[in-house]
């Protein structure tokens, strides 16, 4: 019964409030997006996706979203340039 009373003090956590604090390494972004490290390196340079870090690239949640939008567009048949443009336009419209 003590456990039930303690649980009454807890409130749901709104993760949206904390997304800007998330930092992901290259391998994590690749795993989440389903792409290779070579693809991510190339896309990061080609699309000028901002990263932090000097020795290792660190991506924020916005960069991850951009990568996933590019992947989605490529999966639908767009070439890389068109996929990058589509991802940019999509993000601008939101």
Residue ranges and their predicted role:
Residues 1-31, 45-50, 61-94:
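Arg/Lys-rich, alpha-helical DNA-contact motif
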Residues 53-58:
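Short, Lys/Arg-rich nucleic-acid/phosphate-binding segment
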């Amino acid at each position: 019964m003590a456990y039930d009373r303690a649980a009454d003090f807890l409130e749901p956590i709104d993760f949206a409030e904390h997304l800007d604090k998330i930092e992901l390494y290259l391998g994590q972004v690749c795993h989440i997006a389903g792409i290779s490290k070579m693809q991510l390196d190339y896309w990061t340079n080609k699309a000028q996706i901002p990263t932090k870090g000097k020795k290792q690239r660190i991506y924020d949640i916005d960069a991850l979203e951009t990568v996933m939008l590019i992947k989605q567009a490529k999966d639908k048949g767009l070439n890389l340039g068109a996929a990058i443009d589509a991802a940019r336009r999509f993000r601008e419209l939101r």
